[in-house]
Structures are given as C-alpha cells and as structure tokens.
Amino acid sequence: MRKQILALLLCLVLLVTLLPGTALAAKKKNSPPAFRHHEYEHHYQLQDDSYESTDTEGGYRHYVCADCGDEYSYTTDPLVYETNPKTGERVTQAGAYNPLLPSWEHIPDAEPQVFWSKEDNEWRVYLYGSHDDTGVGYCGFNYMMYSAPVYDLSDWRCDGVYLDISEHATSGATVGLFAPDCAYDVNTDQYYLISNEFNAYSVLRVADNPCGPWDEQEAEWYASVKFIYDPSIYIDRDGTIFIAGSCMKTVYNEYPEIQEMVAADDYKSGMSHIGVLMQLKDDLSDGDGIEAISWLPNDARGYLPIYEGPSLQGWVDELGVYVYFYVSYDVGADGSWYNSGLAWLWTDDLMNGTWHFGENAVDESYVDLDYVISGNHGNIVSDTSGRYAVDPTTGELSFTDFPTYAYGNNHGGLARVNGHWIFIGHRQTGRTAYSRQTVAGEVEVYLDGETPVIKPFEFSSSGVAGSMSAYEMVNADRTTWLTPAVDHPAPSTENNNIHSECKDFDPYITASRDENAVHATYVAELRNGSVVGYKYLDFGTDETAVALRMLVAPGEAGTDAEVSVWLDAPTAEAGGTQLGTVSLTADALAASGETETGTDGTVWTWVEEAMQQPVIGVHGVYFVFASASEEILGSFDQFIFSKG
C-alpha cells in the first residue's frame, strides 16, 4: 500500500511539472534572474604610495593583486588643463553648444562622470544615459556611450553600445533600459554601472573600463525596480557603495512609518514615489546585500515624495556636504504642471543626517506661486523650460514663470569638468516625449557664509561655450526659445504616438536619427506669432552693419510672410531692439533662386536681407514670424550673419 501511494504521488508530481500553466511553472517564471558574477583573474588593490590628482598636480595609482602579487601602475594628469594638448591653444570650451551631442543622437537622463582614460591618457567626461533610439517609446534596450576630453566639450566621440539587453533581457525587462549611472572605485580600479531595467530590476554590474562593455547576463547585485527606480550610484573614498532611487508604493507600504508620513504629506500630483537611499554591504552576496536604508527626511516636512530622476552627487568639497538632485514637480502661475526642473538637497551625514532643501540664489517669489507641490523651494538648478532667464536690462538671472521651450520631463547630473561645474540635463524634441536630447550649462557652486548654494544655469543655445559666432552657420535646431511653448507629456497610442496636447499650432524641432540625412533636423510648423530665439550670438567688438541669410521652406499653402529680427528680447516692451526684417513672400523666395533639397524631399530656399541697424557685442537673437494667415507659413533650418 505504501509503495502504491508513493507511486501515485510520483505520477502527480510528474503530471504537474509537465502541465504548462501550473503554479510551479509560474513560480519558476517569476523567480529571480540567473545572473552570474563577473570573475576577475586578479583582485587588485590600491597601494599606500598612490595619490590622486589635484587641479594643478598630477596623480599616481599603483595596484597589486591580493592573490598573486601581480602589479601595475599609471600616472594621471592634473584635473585642470590650461591649454588644449591637441592644439596648444587656451581652453575656452568654444563650440560646446546645445544640444551637446550630434543632432541625430537622442540620449536623455545623462549622468556626466569624469574618469581617467588609460587608452587616451587624459581626463574625459563620460555620459551615462538612456537611449531614445526609436522615437516611439521611452528608452531602448541599449545604452550608447559618448565621451569627450574635459578640455573640449565640443569634441564628442561615440564609444559605442556599452550594455544591450535586447536579446537576453536576463532581468526580465520588457520595456527597456531606463536612466543609468556609473561610479569608479579607486581602491580596485573598477567601474560600477547601475542600470534600470524597467518593470524588472535595477542591476549593478562591474567592468574595468569606463566604456565597459558590461555583460547583460552578469550582476554583482540587483533589487526590484519598484524599490529602486531610476537608480544612481556613489562610491565613497573607502569603497562603500551607496545607491539612490525612487521607491514605489508597493515597497514602502511595507514600512508603516513611511506609509503614514507619505499619507500625511501635502503632495498632490498623484506621483507618490519617494526617495530611498541604500548603503550596500562590503560583501554584496550577503543576503540582500543592503547594509542600511534611509528615506531622505528633510527639514521642511516628514518625507519628500519624488517621482523619478534622483542623482546622488555625493560629497562636494566646495560645499562641505553631500548633494542629491531630484526631479521637481511644481505648478506655475497659470496652473501648468512642470517637471522640467531639477532641484537639490544636501546633508552632512549621508545615511543618518537631516536633508535640507538647497539654495539657488534666485528670487523665486511670484504671485500665486504659493501652492507649489514638490519642488521650487528655491533649489532648482536646471530647468529646460527656460523659466530661469537673464534679464536683458539688468543682466541678472531671474525666475520668470514664463516657459520659452516645450516643457517635459528632465533628468541629469553634475560634474566638475576642468575646474568648472557643468550640469547635464535633457530637452524635448519631436512631437512626442520620446526624442530627448542632451543639453548642458555651467552652474555656480559656492558657500554663502555657511549656506551651500548651487546657482542654476540659463538654458541657452550657446550652452557651456557662453556664445556662438554670429558669422558662422547656426543650425536652427539649436534654439532654446521656441514659443508658444506647451507641455510635452507622454504621448498617447493614437495617431502614431502623437499626443493630442502637443498641439498642431505650435512649432517644434523635428527629430531625425539618420546621421547621413541632409536638412533633416529643423524648426517645423511655424505660424503667425511664432518666435525662435538663440542665446547668445557674438557679433564682435566693432560695431558693424550686417546682413542675414536664412534657409527656409514655405508651408504647403505657400503663405506669404516676413520675419522680424530682434536683439536681446523679441519685443520692445521686453527690452528688445529690432535689427531688421526678412521677407518670406512667394516673390522673395522665387527671386532668390538659391535652393537645396533635403533628404525627405523638402525644397529649401536661401533668402538674404541687409539689416537696418548696426550691431556690436553679444546678444540674444530672436526671429519673430508674422503672416496675415493662421496657416503654417513654413520651416526654418539654418542662418548666418555677414559683415557689411
């Protein structure tokens, strides 16, 4: 009888394992991924005779394998290059315009990191970001690397794909690779990449090169993406690893005290993710690998709910504190939602200290702006809606609450590059939220007495360079003033992923991914009242008469129009000066006779007019389009000024 029972049980087990829809099969499907650890042949450790570079003195790194005694060493340059070693000229960052990367490339969420390149024998900036490689969905299944020498942020090199999960997706990801980050452990000479494999895991991998590549089937540590969404990494000098992320309700509801704090908060956006910070164990294979968890308390209220985009900067010497950036959700005076601002917090104790809202030294008092939601506590450092602008009459940076560029999500980080603090974020292009481009600007980092301050940068076409020559060709897609500007939310699935709120009546920048295409990235759907602006153009130190050449394509209706050219602001009331006008009538276009054809078949025409006023110095330049019709009057691709 006993044998019969055992035989029956064995048959039942075999039957269950063969059935396709069983609980056992489901359990196997939902089990953690079978990652393998990266096994190095050597385990190198930094030696006591090593020392790091300063701004003026080079460094030395010496490593010995703890297992076999094998060793190697190398020297590093000073952190600041006074002259470009390739040209011998003084470093100016000329040419480091926005967007920062080639127009066909779309890398949002970029975290800038400065690492020593042993292959190039120089300090380089590496951008670790998502990849909007299709334009029909957030973030593809690969990460694409770009890097540049710290002394020339116009000299970007594509270093190729450094992680691709499109074939194996061992973590179970079905959407794509969201915002990554990377940190260097000087103690082991290794680079740790934390990736966000959406709807599955945040995965920590290791490599011995800042460009990887990292193997998609390897992991040193991982956690549910619901626990750590949009992860960021910081490695302290002693090698301790810290991971920051946004935590979702399904996880923090397991912590009653956190759930109660969030429930009592006045956060109204419906995005109730909150900031989480983890200290990992020295032995990442020990249990869950987590040594301690902090929930980012701050001095203004119990806990800070944030939706996404944390960037754990870590220790900043100039401020004497740890710094943490996050996406700021706030409401403008017109009731519009903004998540284009990135804000910051600071603490003097990473895991146990109080988190304080940072200061940005900009007066943000504004009528009816007392109902902000998560951000805008005077701590915005980057806003790609253009609401932080230099007043042309005073020269002071101010908060205007007037968007001058399509606003949508933003995400980025800070790096000290050749002695200057550079903040990287992204802007929206195309008619969806899936064609974001890397942008940059220089911020000021300093102590005001004992108060840490990070002063934001003005979102500008000239970016880190400060200005562009008016006498060199400017691509129209470099605009950072494109009005009327509207919200750029995630698209719906209707109409080929074009969101109904991305109105047909507003100009936008076309999004091309073909690096060989001609006249493929431009300002499209201009109408009466459209303004396209560029900050800043340098006309030189001598006052001179100028002429303007523009490359335009008329709208389908062939609408007659003209464009007024303004300096400093697009209206006299705002402090602008009209420089001249250019006729875009059918007769003017026909008289030109100088045309070029784009890859998409669009016929472009060069028009040229002498300006009515002489000009000198550095100015914002604004093109104000006018027509008697409300139909689309055309598109705008390039322009250049000439003297005389």
Predicted regions located by residue number:
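Surface-exposed loop/turn motifs at beta-strand-loop junctions within extracellular Ig-like
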Residues: 18, 67-69, 625-629
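Sec-dependent signal peptide cleavage junction
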Residues: 16-34
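Positively charged n-region of N-terminal signal peptides that target proteins for export
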Residues: 1-9
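Carbohydrate-active catalytic/glycan-binding domains of CAZyme proteins
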Residues: 32, 78-644
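Extracellular modular ligand-binding repeats in secreted and cell-surface proteins
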Residues: 30-83
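Bacterial N-terminal signal peptides
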Residues: 9-17
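Long, low-complexity, intrinsically disordered N-terminal extensions of eukaryotic proteins, enriched
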Residues: 12, 22-25, 65, 529
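Secreted/processed peptides and extracellular or luminal domains of membrane proteins
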Residues: 20, 71-74, 213
